[in-house]
């Protein structure tokens, strides 16, 4: 077989014509130090603050410190495979997480990767985790109520859509339960909920997810979790990832409720990172920008103007206090950023008052504008009555004779405390709350024994649903109280058939 030189030259020409020179250009640096969730690299002179970098083993990092001869990097994943001398390259991107409807019902880590064993999340939409908060003209005032289903909150410290309301208290006082109940009450309210668990035990998060699943709340909830075994950078980034996922829905005109459980652990993780990066420590060894850490996160919660779709994101950050000290550094920072706080008192909790909300120390600075008129009219004097009861309660313990007016205040106060008690994971509809609070403030419970009040409430709801459903419908439709004659007539009719425990 003869080889023709023409064919060989034609093949060579063809290959030369199809040959393309593609240059792969990347700015790279060399790792000079790695350990404790951070790395340092030399040679990345043009790296930007917050830029994603890729290590030679595929793990990503984020630029935190820009110094004259190297950059400080937080490692977003397992840093065991990174060695001194490894190559690290710029990506030109900032950190983004997947967003959209595909995230609903899933449990993910702060990088948006699923950790629930239900397969990959099919979405192409992403959003940067750091995003500028809406400006003044892009917002509108809080005007719609966000019902938590908890009587003590909806009556005394109401929350509006777009508000930031802090839940603060010692460990084991029911902070998470209050937030989970608020999520459960958003069923059929056209709300998307995001629960961000920061440094919570995996077993605890699993229990919360099971509760949400069992009660049908995972149909509208995203869970973002960074456990205590995760590197500190992931605990630091978790709230921002959750905020980005919620913002996507807010920008599309939807309403979002986001819970950060809890920001104390995020501040601790950020302190750890800052100290390892050799940033100068300040009060309680926190870095100087720890206020900005939380303010830039919580300012992203907003009620957007109608021109931008009128969506909202309501934030419920949680802060854990030590021995009830709300004057510590992180608690005072977050109190000053938020629009009010719900203070949970350990003494009340252990004496059986649950939820253990301290009405005196709790406040809502904007939610009152969003409260429905029916709730406003029945809850108006409640806080004052409760405060005077707490004051008189301490005097009455001395056992001195009390006049009739003081005794009446004490009796009413005991019934207020009893009515505001509520079992966990059993939120009430707003019309039911209005009905029992109307009965309370109009004296219908004054003759009911304190031990009978829980039964009185449940039987009253059954009676109204069966015989006077129109009252509930009126409250829901008009947001106002029905005529007093109708309300009093229904409560008088129920009082005739209600039997005290002793009479049974």
UniProtKB/Swiss-Prot annotation:
Where is the protein found, in the record's own terms? Cell membrane
The record's SUPFAM superfamilies line, in alphabetical order, gives: C-terminal domain of alpha and beta subunits of F1 ATP synthase, N-terminal domain of alpha and beta subunits of F1 ATP synthase, P-loop containing nucleoside triphosphate hydrolases
> In this UniProt entry, which residues are annotated as the site Required for activity?
362
Going by the entry's taxonomy, the superkingdom of the source organism is recorded as: Bacteria
Q: Please give an example of a GO cellular component term from this record.
A: proton-transporting ATP synthase complex
Recorded hits in Pfam families, A to Z, give:
ATP-synt_ab (PF00006), ATP-synt_ab_C (PF00306), ATP-synt_ab_N (PF02874)
Could you tell me the keywords of this UniProt record? Answer: ATP synthesis, ATP-binding, Cell membrane, CF(1), Hydrogen ion transport, Ion transport, Membrane, Nucleotide-binding, Translocase, Transport
Reaction catalysed? ATP + H2O + 4 H(+)(in) = ADP + phosphate + 5 H(+)(out)
Q: Where does ATP bind?
A: 169-176
EC number of the protein: 7.1.2.2
Record-linked NCBIfam families: atpA, PRK13343.1
Q: What is this protein called?
A: ATP synthase subunit alpha
């Amino acid at each position: 077989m003869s080889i023709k030189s023409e064919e060989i030259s034609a093949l060579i020409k063809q290959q030369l014509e199809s040959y393309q020179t593609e240059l792969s250009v990347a700015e790279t640096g060399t790792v000079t130090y790695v350990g404790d969730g951070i790395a340092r690299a030399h040679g990345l002179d043009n790296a930007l603050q917050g830029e994603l970098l890729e290590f030679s083993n595929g793990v990503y990092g984020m630029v935190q410190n820009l110094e004259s001869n190297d950059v400080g990097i937080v490692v977003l994943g397992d840093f065991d495979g990174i060695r001194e001398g490894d190559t690290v390259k710029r990506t030109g991107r900032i950190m983004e997480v997947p967003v959209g409807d595909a995230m609903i019902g899933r449990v993910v880590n702060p990088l948006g990767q699923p950790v629930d064993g239900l397969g990959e999340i099919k979405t192409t939409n992403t959003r940067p985790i750091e995003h500028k908060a809406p400006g003044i003209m892009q917002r509108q005032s809080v005007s719609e109520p966000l019902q938590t289903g908890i009587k003590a909150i909806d009556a005394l410290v109401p929350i509006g859509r777009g508000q930031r309301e802090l839940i603060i208290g010692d460990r084991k006082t029911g902070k998470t339960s209050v937030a989970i109940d608020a999520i459960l009450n958003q069923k059929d309210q056209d709300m998307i909920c995001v629960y961000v668990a920061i440094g919570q035990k995996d077993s605890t998060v699993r229990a919360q997810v099971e509760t949400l699943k069992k009660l049908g709340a995972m149909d509208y909830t995203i869970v973002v979790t960074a456990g205590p075994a995760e590197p500190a950078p992931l605990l630091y980034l978790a709230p921002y990832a959750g905020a980005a996922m919620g913002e996507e829905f807010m920008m599309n005109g939807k309403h979002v409720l986001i819970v950060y459980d809890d920001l104390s652990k995020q501040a601790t993780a950020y302190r750890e990172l800052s100290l390892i990066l050799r940033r100068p420590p300040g009060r309680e060894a926190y870095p100087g920008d720890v206020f900005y850490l939380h303010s830039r996160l919580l300012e992203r919660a907003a009620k957007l103007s109608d021109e931008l779709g009128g969506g909202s994101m309501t934030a419920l950050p949680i802060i854990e206090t030590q021995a009830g000290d709300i004057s510590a550094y992180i608690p005072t920072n977050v109190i000053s950023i938020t629009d009010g706080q719900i203070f949970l008192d350990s003494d009340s909790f252990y004496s059986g008052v649950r939820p253990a909300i301290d009405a005196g120390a709790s406040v809502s600075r904007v939610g009152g504008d969003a409260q429905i008129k029916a709730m406003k009219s029945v809850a108006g004097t409640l806080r004052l009555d409760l405060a005077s009861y707490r004051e008189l309660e301490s005097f009455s313990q001395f056992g001195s004779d009390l006049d009739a007016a003081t005794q009446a205040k004490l009796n009413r106060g005991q019934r207020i405390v009893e009515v505001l008690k509520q079992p966990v994971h059993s939120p009430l509809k707003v019309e039911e709350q209005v009905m029992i609070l109307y009965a309370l403030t109009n004296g219908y419970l004054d003759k009911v024994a304190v031990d009978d009040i829980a039964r009185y409430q449940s039987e009253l709801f059954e009676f109204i649903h069966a015989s006077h459903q129109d009252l509930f419908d009126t409250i829901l439709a008009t947001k106002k109280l029905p005529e007093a004659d109708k309300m009093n007539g229904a409560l008088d009719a129920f009082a005739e058939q209600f039997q005290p425990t002793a009479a049974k």
